């Protein structure tokens, strides 16, 4: 086997892509900070049980496992940073009020999410802990859309769903609750024949409501249809009201309601929002409420947040990250060295051409030169 081969769905990030990823990372983290989010950096490696406190079987399957040579315990390479941030909020920070946290780091997956997807993503996201009201969901949704606009994306479609609708239907029917996981799978995959089979012997009201969910899809007006077709339960009414407010806030994007779109993170407990871009089949960003995620760490707090993969964002972003630079000669000259240092201190990129190498790679656009004129080093256009 060639020593330069990499595992399937694992790839190096070359300079042009890395530059774009880093530009986007800085833009997004700066925007998060402007909202008041504090950055945290959880470890890439943790004890397996700490990583799998939520997320269900899918997260367990996607997590790489290995044995710790020091303790003999099973470790996991994180496949999702959100549970780690919940642990930090619940156990380490232990604050009583609202906490805003953000992060950016690598995650590893045992299996790719798609045919050409990478198994090493760069996950970036933001979370709000400590506020159960819809205001936190509205802020997170706005921040997610801001992040996509900062990346230069347009023609964004925002899909909205609410985990509380299905939860309310299962809570009122014990027989349906026993089939909760199968119903979840059928709804997520919009497998209507399977859904019909699973609901055939349920009570008439529950059966009709569950079978209606895959068809409650469309613009915000579908919420009126949902109010007519679903049982009048306080939890469902509240969920539909939340979705109406989230849809109204999403200015400048196409909004779709899909009450069966339960794909994604298994730990959602409330509103869920997913962003799609024209021409890209998979979601570019996902978010929502997951109030119970910190319970495994001894302190369940209201929580809502979103995340996306920076590598995928860089792939589809139209922004141009190729920076300009100044080309300078190489010489053991104190005045030249001082001029180069001053330019770099001012934020300029200065590339010194090493002796014998006339060819300059185009990773930076050297649109200016540092030249000596009348005993002084000055910058001139090339």
From Swiss-Prot:
Q: Record keywords: Cytoplasm included?
A: yes
In which organism is this protein found?
Burkholderia ambifaria (strain ATCC BAA-244 / DSM 16087 / CCUG 44356 / LMG 19182 / AMMD) (Burkholderia cepacia (strain AMMD))
Q: Does the keyword Transmembrane apply?
A: no
Which Gene Ontology CC terms are recorded?
A: cytoplasm
In Swiss-Prot or TrEMBL terms, this protein is called: ATP phosphoribosyltransferase regulatory subunit
One of this protein's Pfam families, by short name? tRNA-synt_His
Subcellular location per UniProt equals: Cytoplasm
InterPro entries reported in the protein's UniProt record: aa-tRNA-synth_II/BPL/LPL, HisRS-like_core, HisRS/HisZ, HisZ
What does this protein's UniProt record list under function? Required for the first step of histidine biosynthesis. May allow the feedback regulation of ATP phosphoribosyltransferase activity by histidine.
Supply one GO BP term: histidyl-tRNA aminoacylation
What else does the entry mention about this protein? This function is generally fulfilled by the C-terminal part of HisG, which is missing in some bacteria such as this one.
Q: How does it assemble?
A: Heteromultimer composed of HisG and HisZ subunits.
Q: Which family is this protein grouped under? A: Belongs to the class-II aminoacyl-tRNA synthetase family. HisZ subfamily.
Q: What is the lineage of its organism?
A: Bacteria, Pseudomonadati, Pseudomonadota, Betaproteobacteria, Burkholderiales
The alphabetical list of record keywords is: Amino-acid biosynthesis, Cytoplasm, Histidine biosynthesis
Pathway listed for it is:
Amino-acid biosynthesis; L-histidine biosynthesis; L-histidine from 5-phospho-alpha-D-ribose 1-diphosphate: step 1/9
Annotated GO molecular function terms are: histidine-tRNA ligase activity
Principal cellular location given in the protein's record: cytoplasm
């Amino acid at each position: 086997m060639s020593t330069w081969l990499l595992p399937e769905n694992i790839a190096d990030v070359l300079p042009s892509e890395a530059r774009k990823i880093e530009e986007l990372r800085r833009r997004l983290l700066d925007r998060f900070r402007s909202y008041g989010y504090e950055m945290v950096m959880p470890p890439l490696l943790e004890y397996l049980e700490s990583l799998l406190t939520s997320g269900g079987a899918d997260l367990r399957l996607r997590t790489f496992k290995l044995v710790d040579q020091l303790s003999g315990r099973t470790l996991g390479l994180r496949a999702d940073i959100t549970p780690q941030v919940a642990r930090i909020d619940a156990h380490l920070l232990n604050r009583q009020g609202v906490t805003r946290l953000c992060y950016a780091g690598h995650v590893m997956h045992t299996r790719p999410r798609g045919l050409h997807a990478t198994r090493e993503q760069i996950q970036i996201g933001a979370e709000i802990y400590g506020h159960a009201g819809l205001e936190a969901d509205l802020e997170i949704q706005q921040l997610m859309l801001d992040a996509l606009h900062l990346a230069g994306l347009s023609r964004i479609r925002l899909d909205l769903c609410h985990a509380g609708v299905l939860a309310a239907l299962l809570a009122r029917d014990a027989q349906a609750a026993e089939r909760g996981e199968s119903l979840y799978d059928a709804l997520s995959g919009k497998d209507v024949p399977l859904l019909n089979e699973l609901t055939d012997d349920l009570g008439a009201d529950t059966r009709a409501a569950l079978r209606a969910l895959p068809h409650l899809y469309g613009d915000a007006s579908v919420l009126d249809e949902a109010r007519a077709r679903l049982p009048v339960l306080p939890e469902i009414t509240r969920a539909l009201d939340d979705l109406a407010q989230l849809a109204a806030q999403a200015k400048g994007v196409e909004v779709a309601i899909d009450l069966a779109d339960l794909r994604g993170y298994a730990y959602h407990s409330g509103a869920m929002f997913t962003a799609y871009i024209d021409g890209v089949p998979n979601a570019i960003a996902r978010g929502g409420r997951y109030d119970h995620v910190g319970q495994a760490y001894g302190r369940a707090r209201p929580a809502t947040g979103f995340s996306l993969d920076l590598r995928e964002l860089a792939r589809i972003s139209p922004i141009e990250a190729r920076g300009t630079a100044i080309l300078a000669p190489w010489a053991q000259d104190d005045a030249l060295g001082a001029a180069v240092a001053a330019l770099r201190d001012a934020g300029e990129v200065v590339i010194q051409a090493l002796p014998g190498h006339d060819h300059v790679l185009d990773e930076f656009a050297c649109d200016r030169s540092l030249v000596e004129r009348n005993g002084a080093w000055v910058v001139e256009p090339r």
